[in-house]
Curated annotation (Swiss-Prot):
Belongs to the aldehyde dehydrogenase family. RocA subfamily. The active site is at 286, 320. It comes from Halalkalibacterium halodurans (strain ATCC BAA-125 / DSM 18197 / FERM 7344 / JCM 9153 / C-125). It catalyses: L-glutamate 5-semialdehyde + NAD(+) + H2O = L-glutamate + NADH + 2 H(+). Pathway: Amino-acid degradation; L-proline degradation into L-glutamate; L-glutamate from L-proline: step 2/2. This is 1-pyrroline-5-carboxylate dehydrogenase 1. Its EC number is 1.2.1.88. Gene3D superfamilies: Aldehyde Dehydrogenase, Chain A, domain 1, Aldehyde Dehydrogenase, Chain A, domain 2. Pfam families: Aldedh. Keywords: NAD, Oxidoreductase. The lineage of its organism: Bacteria, Bacillati, Bacillota, Bacilli, Bacillales. GO terms for cellular component: cytoplasmic side of plasma membrane.
């Protein structure tokens, strides 16, 4: 019997033994850099001439790994493999499926620093962020294992005399999982194992910038006893392989995390019924946000500045939950701005293998150029308070940037930047602050810093986001504690790490028997 779920503790790097263990893991992983990784289809290794090369964003000439690249023919084989495996996997006892997740969690826990070190090298994550990513991956495995056992009990419904009624859940079929690079382990793990533990089979297309850590995880599932064909690893082009998988008539479920533009396009494609398709596809998408930290007049201003800083600059702002907007009551605007700027100027930016660096690089050259172009727009729209500089000579580094005095309709107040940039805007009162906070097409996370109980209750009703936090940062959701997913163009409000998430991967069935 499984013990009650509790989240994986974060590593305390003030402890010397933990620091040494992590440094050793970084060294071990560095010796593994540059290796080749095959596709995995029906448990078989498939090597292709065409490769996806994964580069360290902090050392852009350092090859992390070379991964075989799938084409449409191989994507077809992966779909057929998943479809065949589904015929048996769907009937495996849910407790047995859950136990595979628990075993996988134990394997990653034993190799926790190793997986975090891969994230440092491949995704450019600083120690603390990489450690949290790995811990979240473990959490998804442990939490969903327990949730599946609970879900397998079904739901109680009524029966009449002489009639027995049951209501339970059944798997859907082949699932296409398209995972992002920013939580290259955690979100990839969560969106892959949720369909697996519910009895579906998976074709996994990881982000092309972080395919190596995904390959490492598929190996973990194999070691944990997952039968061949239940997960198929097919990195490839979104336009070629991604579209093919989404369009396929045997695809039953699609789970995607990424940009709004790609997510909306995927949603549209999935709605089309293809020749040979006898079902409507279900789509679970999480598409990002333009998230706001609201600071009230009576707030703790030091807490406000710290909350804005952590929300905006953790992992260089490359989180869908990042607080890229700060909306401050006019009476405390100048003081909060001054405090936040002072904190930002003390942040260190550099190679994330160095524990002393708070921020590492952004993910690649394309992201670097996009963020720098937004900063130039911001300089014209508002007042640059700190940062604004970038250096791509050895890696893709951008200084933490604060732009003040922005109109709520300004470009950098409206569009997702996905970088270390936070925009400040002034509110006349609390009603006005909430109005500004809600005036984007997104609705993912938000935070309110206030001591006013009436304003807390008002924000609960009126701040239209899926994850709302009070008197803390708007990032850092923990599986099982803060089910995660947003409104409007942030996605389908499918609450990852929540009690009803697994049911989205299944179909409810009612059985009525007379006796």
């Amino acid at each position: 019997m499984l013990q009650p779920y509790k989240h994986e503790p974060f590593t305390d790097f003030t402890v010397e033994a933990n620091r040494k263990a992590f440094e050793e893991a970084l060294g071990l992983v560095e010796k593994e850099l540059g290796k080749e990784y095959p596709l995995i289809i029906n448990g078989e290794r498939v090597t292709t001439e065409d490769k996806i090369q994964s580069w360290n964003p902090a050392r852009k000439d350092q090859l992390v790994g070379s991964v075989s690249k799938a084409n449409q023919d191989l994507a077809e084989k992966a779909i057929q493999s998943a479809d065949e495996a589904f015929q048996t996997w769907r009937n495996v006892n849910p407790e047995e499926r859950a136990n595979i997740l628990v075993k996988a969690a134990a394997i990653i826990r034993r190799r926790k620093h190793e997986f975090s070190a891969w994230l440092v090298h491949e995704a450019g994550k600083p120690w603390k962020e990489a450690d949290a990513d790995t811990a979240e991956a473990i959490d998804f495995l442990e939490y969903y294992a327990r949730q599946m056992i609970e879900l397998n009990r079904g739901k109680e419904i009524l029966s009449r005399p002489g009639e027995q009624n049951r209501y339970f859940y059944t798997p859907m079929g082949v699932t296409v999982t398209i995972s992002p690079w920013n939580f290259a382990l955690a979100i990839m793990v969560g969106t892959a194992v949720a369909p697996i533990v519910t009895g579906n089979t998976v074709v996994l297309k990881p982000a092309s910038t972080t395919p190596v850590v995904a390959a490492k995880f598929v190996e973990v599932l194999e070691d944990a006893g997952l039968p061949k064909g239940v997960i198929n690893y097919v990195p490839g082009s979104g336009a070629e392989v991604g579209d093919y998988l989404v369009d396929h008539p045997k695809t039953s479920l699609i789970t995607f995390t990424g940009s709004k533009d790609v997510g909306v396009r995927l949603y549209e494609r999935a709605a089309v019924v293809r020749p040979g398709q006898n079902h409507l596809k279900r789509v679970i998408v999480e598409m990002g946000g333009k998230d706001t930290v609201v600071v009230d007049r009576d707030a703790d201003l030091d807490l406000a500045a710290e909350s804005i800083l952590v929300s905006a600059f953790g992992f260089s702002g490359q989180k869908c939950s990042a607080g890229s907007r700060a909306v401050i009551h006019k009476d405390v605007y100048d003081e909060v701005l001054e405090k936040t700027v002072a904190l930002a100027k003390n942040l260190t930016v550099g190679d994330p293998t160095n524990r002393d660096n708070y921020m590492g690089p952004v993910i690649d050259e394309k992201a670097f150029e996009k963020i720098m172009s937004y900063i130039e727009i911001g300089k014209k729209e508002g007042r640059l308070m700190t940062g604004g500089e970038g250096d791509s000579s050895t890696g893709f580094f951008i200084q933490p940037t604060i732009i003040a005095d922005l109109d709520p309709e300004a470009v950098i107040m409206q569009e997702e930047i996905f970088g270390p940039v936070v925009a400040f805007s002034k509110a006349n009162d609390f009603d006005h602050a909430l109005e500004i906070a809600n005036n984007t097409e997104y609705g993912l996370t938000g935070a309110v810093i206030t001591r006013n109980r009436a304003h807390i209750e008002q924000a609960k009703r009126e701040f239209h986001v899926g994850n709302l936090y009070f008197n803390r940062n708007c990032t850092g959701a923990i599986v099982g504690y803060h089910p995660f997913g947003g409104f409007k163009m942030s996605g389908t409000d499918s609450k990852a790490g929540g009690p009803d998430y697994l049911a989205l991967h299944m179909q409810a069935k009612t059985v009525s028997e007379m006796y």
